[in-house]
Design a protein with these regions (language model features):
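Short acidic-hydrophobic surface loop/beta-edge motif
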Residues: 36-42
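Catalytic histidine-centered segment of alpha/beta-hydrolase-like enzymes
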Residues: 308-316
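Sec/Tat signal peptide C-region and signal peptidase I cleavage site
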Residues: 23-27
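Flexible "cap/lid" subdomain of the alpha/beta-hydrolase fold that forms the substrate-access gate
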Residues: 29-34, 45-47, 52, 59, ...
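Bacterial N-terminal signal peptides
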Residues: 10-22
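Short, amphipathic alpha-helical "lid/cap" segments that border enzyme active or binding sites
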Residues: 115, 240, 317-325
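Bacterial N-terminal signal peptides that target proteins for export
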Residues: 1-13
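Conserved HGGG/HGGXW glycine-rich cap/lid loop of the alpha/beta-hydrolase fold
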Residues: 51-100, 291
Length: 330
């Protein structure tokens, strides 16, 4: 990260809750939108989403990860709306109020399917181009949209950088310490793991939150707001499918095969991008130097200091808002 970026993101952290609370007070009506979920048919789904800010503002789509939900952006979205952005925060397939339109559609969690969902959502909302930002599954989804549909992406904010992969890569063993960090992926590869996650979804998710962000002191009330979204009837199936697909244990759907072939060569991302990394990210993640060359357009990287872990928009919303604004202006 260049010196200017270092000052910028460190300053954003220093501003802390004062800036955030100011935005929250000014945007109380917008913040209430998180309790007023809208629904729209898009592709295979009826997608639940929040839509706040001026309708003629620059669209920003914020994508959550696993096992999180749209509440990761409960403070980011109103702050961006106050800056004039139209902010859309969808539930991914298998979360919250998002539902499949047909009982016969495979409950498929492969990454390119989730990316296609976002393109379908943009089409349904008549959004030609948007700023995309995400972490965990959301970052991977945003990366894929930027790689396959760059004309639809004005800018990108991706926590942990370039997360595009392939089944061929997923089949290759890693060093023992790295394999250990993916323990839940191997657990989900077994019938016991699927049954265990179904039986203990909330406890499992809370455990992952602690592991991924070891210094994040979230409250029971904060977790409970998200836990409800994990009660989606397709959540377990989508989760298991996602991790099994990565290991090559599921083939995925034929209609996404063309996307997967293009992603397998690890295409560059050409849109203006800011990548972020939390200093205390306890989840598996690549080193920034390892993916720098994959971003061939305007680019900056920001390291978020202190206790910030795997979920920067919820752990340090001020810095995340700054990153979205800066990426939009690159």
């Amino acid at each position: 990260m260049n010196r200017l970026s270092l000052v910028r993101y460190t300053s954003a952290v220093a501003l802390g809750l004062s800036t955030l609370w100011s935005a929250a007070v000014c945007a109380a009506e917008d913040a209430g939108a998180f309790d007023k979920i809208q629904q729209i048919r898009a592709g295979d789904l009826n997608i639940g989403y929040v839509d706040i800010g001026p309708r003629d503002g620059q669209p920003v789509i914020l994508l959550h990860g696993w096992p999180y939900d749209i509440q990761s952006y409960a403070q980011v979205a109103p702050a961006l709306a106050q800056k004039g952005y139209r902010v859309i925060v969808p539930y991914l397939r298998g979360y919250g109020t998002t539902r499949f339109l047909s009982a016969g559609t495979p409950r498929n969690g492969q990454p390119s399917a989730m990316a296609a969902d976002i393109v379908h959502l943009m089409d349904a909302l008549n959004i030609r181009q948007a700023d995309l930002a995400g972490f965990d599954w959301g970052a991977r989804t945003a990366d894929i949209v930027a790689a396959l549909w760059p004309q639809r992406v004005k800018s990108l904010v991706s926590v942990s950088g370039y997360l595009i992969s392939s089944q061929q890569i997923g089949e290759k063993p890693l060093p023992p310490q790295a394999e250990l960090s993916w323990w839940y992926q191997f657990y989900f590869a077994t019938p016991r793991g699927e049954a265990g996650y179904r039986q203990n979804t909330h406890d499992f998710a809370k455990f992952i939150w602690h592991q991924a962000s070891p210094q994040w002191q979230f409250s029971d009330a904060t977790f409970a707001k998200t836990a409800r979204a994990l009660d989606n009837p397709d959540h377990v199936a989508i989760t298991i499918s996602n991790y099994r697909w990565r290991l090559g244990l599921e083939k995925g759907e034929a209609k996404y095969a063309g996307y997967e072939q293009r992603l397998a060569v690890l295409p560059p991302i050409t849109v203006p991008t800011i990548t972020l990394e939390g200093a205390n990210n306890g989840a598996p993640h690549p080193a920034p130097a390892s993916y720098r060359a994959k971003f061939t357009g305007k680019y900056e990287h920001g390291d978020l200091p202190g206790a910030v872990g795997h979920n920067p928009p919820q752990e340090d919303p001020t810095a995340f808002v700054q990153a979205v604004v800066d990426a939009d202006r690159l």
